[in-house]
UniProtKB/Swiss-Prot annotation:
PANTHER family: ATP SYNTHASE SUBUNIT B, ATP SYNTHASE SUBUNIT B', CHLOROPLASTIC. F-type ATPases have 2 components, F(1) - the catalytic core - and F(0) - the membrane proton channel. F(1) has five subunits: alpha(3), beta(3), gamma(1), delta(1), epsilon(1). F(0) has three main subunits: a(1), b(2) and c(10-14). The alpha and beta chains form an alternating ring which encloses part of the gamma chain. F(1) is attached to F(0) by a central stalk formed by the gamma and epsilon chains, while a peripheral stalk is formed by the delta and b chains. GO terms for cellular component: plasma membrane; proton-transporting ATP synthase complex. This is ATP synthase subunit b. It comes from Flavobacterium psychrophilum (strain ATCC 49511 / DSM 21280 / CIP 103535 / JIP02/86). InterPro entries: ATP_synth_B-like_membr_sf, ATP_synth_b/b'su_bac/chlpt, ATP_synth_F0_bsu_bac, ATP_synthase_B_chain. Keywords: ATP synthesis, Cell inner membrane, Cell membrane, CF(0), Hydrogen ion transport, Ion transport, Membrane, Transmembrane, Transmembrane helix, Transport. CDD domains: ATP-synt_Fo_b.
Amino acid sequence: MEQLLGQFSLGLFILQIILFVGLILLLKKFAWKPILDAVNEREDGIKNALLSAENARTEMQNLQADNQRILQEARLERDNMLKDAREIKEKMIADSKTEAQAQGIKMIEQAKAAIESEKNAAMAELKSQVSNLSIEIAEKLLKDELSNKDAQTKLVEKMLGDVKLN
């Protein structure tokens, strides 16, 4: 170490300090700024990428929430449509049953009316035939007692009117 101190030159030392400071100034002016700019740009790029990733993650979560909401709404709408369709089907079935019952009752009433009409017509025909037969029988039996046919018809109708047929 003593040898180094003996070889020490103040002029060389000052020259080395001036060169070192000059080198630092040159590096600061030409290299340091581009290096810091590149580091800052890289840092900003990383921050932007992280923000973009966070925004994308948030957007993805929002989209998933929207998809779930839309899916839930679609399910509710489907359930409501199925419920409405079932109600319409049941109403149509009930209406058809009611209409069929009404038509059945109407047909039964028409059939009863037709039967009653036929029955009355048959009864009238039967009464007419019975009265004609009765007249013929009475005419034969009572030919001597009643000479007038009108009186004979009145008597038979009176007797048939007294007899009620079911």
